[in-house]
């Protein structure tokens, strides 16, 4: 019997693993594109919040006239929210969007390789984990591809497609075509530390932290310089707080460890803030202090 092949045409059901900020946005994009979508999240509260967040996002689209109420309901009808990874045993394509940890993602890819049919392409939304490490724990390295969506996934057009030397042209082309079908503008990146977007933004953030650390200027003026001088919507220190300083440190360490070049060494000030639990908006304190609703304190 001839083994089933994955083509864009026969992808009907997409599995999204992880219901955090990225996962819920990716699942919404998949369902809005017309795919039956299974979102897997083991934590009940996170799964519940993800569903509520998607409904709120769709409600907003209706209010703005971007979609009709009928479309809103059809999108939700295409979505299933599951607790167990075994629920992905009949999907045609997988996008993993779990926590940014090599060990966690390796365990997930081992499970996906066991659960999913052999023709299924396994993708990851990682922003910093080396794709080759994930491909190496599967029996299908040629079908492991990176799909790095930008935040928020339902709004941002760019998508980084990451391929390893083992990634087949067939798998790459399917992911590229799927990205375009989802309304994204894909760019192709090799399996290099932090790829393009994370590499550039983390270098930018780290240099801003060094400016603060070395007394070049105040945090407010560093951020103002980039907002008013370069037309950035957020200053680099505000952006770091928004991302989460623990996540920022993790990505910068991935860059430094990947290249072993001094220019990527994380600033000691960032390490100090993370060590004492000042992680940005999510903890109420980072470079700035925040209210419970995430707004910056005066």
Model-found features: residue ranges?
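NAD(P)-dependent Rossmann-like dehydrogenase/reductase catalytic/cofactor-binding core
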Residues: 2-8, 35, 170-173, 180-191, ...
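Rossmann-like dinucleotide-binding cores of NAD(P)H-dependent redox enzymes
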Residues: 39-72, 161-171, 186, 193-201
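NAD(P)+-binding Rossmann beta1-loop-alpha1 motif at the extreme N-terminus of oxidoreductases
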Residues: 2-59
């Amino acid at each position: 019997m001839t083994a089933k092949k994955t083509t864009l045409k026969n992808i009907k059901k997409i599995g999204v693993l992880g219901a955090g900020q990225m996962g819920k946005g990716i699942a919404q994009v998949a369902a809005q594109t017309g795919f039956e979508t299974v979102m897997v999240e083991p934590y009940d509260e996170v799964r519940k919040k993800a569903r509520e967040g998607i409904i709120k996002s769709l409600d907003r689209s209706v209010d703005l006239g971007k979609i009709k109420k009928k479309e809103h309901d059809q999108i939700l009808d295409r979505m299933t929210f599951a607790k167990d990874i075994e629920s992905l045993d009949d999907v045609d394509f997988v996008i993993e969007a779990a926590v940014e940890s090599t060990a966690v993602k390796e365990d997930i890819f081992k499970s996906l390789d066991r659960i999913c049919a052999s023709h299924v392409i396994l993708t990851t939304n990682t922003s910093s984990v080396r794709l080759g490490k994930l491909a190496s724990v599967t029996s299908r390295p040629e079908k492991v591809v990176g799909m790095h969506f930008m935040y928020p996934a339902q709004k941002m057009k760019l998508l980084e497609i990451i391929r390893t030397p083992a990634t087949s042209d067939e798998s790459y082309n399917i992911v590229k075509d799927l990205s375009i079908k989802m309304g994204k503008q894909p760019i192709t990146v090799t399996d290099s530390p932090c790829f393009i977007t994370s590499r550039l933004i983390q270098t930018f953030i780290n240099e801003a932290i060094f400016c603060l650390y070395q007394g070049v200027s105040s945090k407010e003026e560093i951020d103002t310089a980039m907002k008013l001088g370069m037309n950035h919507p957020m200053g680099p220190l505000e952006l770091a707080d928004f991302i989460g300083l623990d996540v920022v440190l993790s990505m910068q360490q991935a860059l430094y460890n990947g290249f072993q070049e001094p220019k990527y060494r994380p600033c000691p000030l960032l390490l100090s803030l993370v060590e004492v639990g000042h992680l940005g908006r999510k903890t109420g304190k980072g470079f700035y202090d925040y209210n419970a609703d995430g707004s910056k304190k005066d």
